[in-house]
């Protein structure tokens, strides 16, 4: 068994720009299917816009000192019947004994099967440095909301801490 939990917080700087303000916390318990990297997943997602939902899915993961790759295909057990793909991919090659490059690609595509249209998608990119549990650098977020894929972009700096 393993646990996957991620917290994503997004807030606009400008007043009156509420599209994209959100907190999303997906979490799941995985049951490994042998040593293939594949797992059956069950969990939920707390979402400041959509509320709470339970999910079932399939996960593939691979983790080394330099690479982290997690792919999750899940189905939300709700009236919306959302099917979601989530991917998180990191590359962290060492520069010295204490420092490494940090790069990350995180994406989601959520399709509402009951309504038959796109609900939410995003692509988050990070590039920077890492020393121990601390990471920092430049980031870009590309978000799309609803069936017409209303877009929001955000560029800036990021910090992160690995627990």
Task: Give a label for each model feature.
Residues 12-21, 44-54, 74-85, 111-119, ...:
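Solvent-exposed loop/turn segments connecting transmembrane beta-strands
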